[in-house]
Amino acid sequence: MGQKIHPFGFRLSVQKNWSSRWYANSNNFPAMLSSDIKVREFLKKKLAHAAVSKIVIERPAKNAKITIYSARPGIVIGKKGEDIESLRSGLQGLMGVPVHLNIEEVRKPEIDATLIAESIAQQLEKRVMFRRAMKRAMQNAMRLGAQGIKIMSSGRLNGIEIARTEWYREGRVPLHTLRADIDYGVAEAKTTYGIIGIKVWVFKGEVFGNKIEQAAQPAEPEKKVRKSGAKNAATS
């Protein structure tokens, strides 16, 4: 189960929290869920170059509070706060309620799974060799304190005729251990050969109460190649 299920959904009742935090009755739920999806798509489009890791949406009493976690908060805020005011007005138009925006800085983007996946996707779009991009990302993550990392790429890697899946792992990535703090991220690289999907799992330690166990000695990197048909080229 741990190998197939989404790592966040598997750990929601143990250590992870929801990205949308509000309550709605059965009549209002579809509209509010649709609004959340539109907000995330709007922010993803507007902040494509701001290295956004996570967006948390809360709805207290006829208001909305949106927290954006970014490795480049200066790009989100803009000169003298102009960009963030433009974002706020756009979000208020989408949601129909007053919106409060908070910007949180991601201090270690090298061990953030979403930012790692997006970085690899950008490199693949610039025709960097996928193995080089994956290994460089793994080395940076292990150097900055990750206990383990696994990166998977799927599609027409290096422009080959038949799509395949290739992954590398360094250290431990215990997906079935509920107390393991696993960060997970996905991205798509739109290359001239088609879409290449990237998935990243980062193991940051085991959670005991509010404490995370520190990193142990890293293991040797592991590589595995699995060939698949073209219909499995891209990952979601």
From Swiss-Prot:
Task: Give an example GO molecular function.
Answer: rRNA binding
Which InterPro entries would you find in this protein's record?
A: KH_dom, KH_dom-like_a/b, KH_dom_type_2, KH_sf_prok-type, Ribosomal_S3_C_sf, Ribosomal_uS3_bac-typ, Ribosomal_uS3_C, Ribosomal_uS3_CS
> Where in this chain does the record put each KH type-2 domain?
39-107
Q: In which domain of life is the source organism classified?
A: Bacteria
Read off the PROSITE patterns from this record.
Answer: KH_TYPE_2, RIBOSOMAL_S3
Q: Is rRNA-binding set as a keyword in this record?
A: yes
Record region (Disordered): 215-236
Q: Which UniProt keywords apply?
A: Ribonucleoprotein, Ribosomal protein, RNA-binding, rRNA-binding
Biological process according to GO? translation
Q: Pfam families from the entry?
A: KH_2, Ribosomal_S3_C
Q: Name one GO cellular component term.
A: cytosolic small ribosomal subunit
Q: Belongs to which family?
A: Belongs to the universal ribosomal protein uS3 family.
Per the entry, what this protein does is:
Binds the lower part of the 30S subunit head. Binds mRNA in the 70S ribosome, positioning it for translation.
What interactions and quaternary structure are annotated?
Part of the 30S ribosomal subunit. Forms a tight complex with proteins S10 and S14.
Kindly give the HAMAP family that the UniProt entry links to this protein.
Answer: Ribosomal_uS3_B
Q: What is this protein called?
A: Small ribosomal subunit protein uS3
What species was this sequence derived from?
A: Methylobacillus flagellatus (strain ATCC 51484 / DSM 6875 / VKM B-1610 / KT)
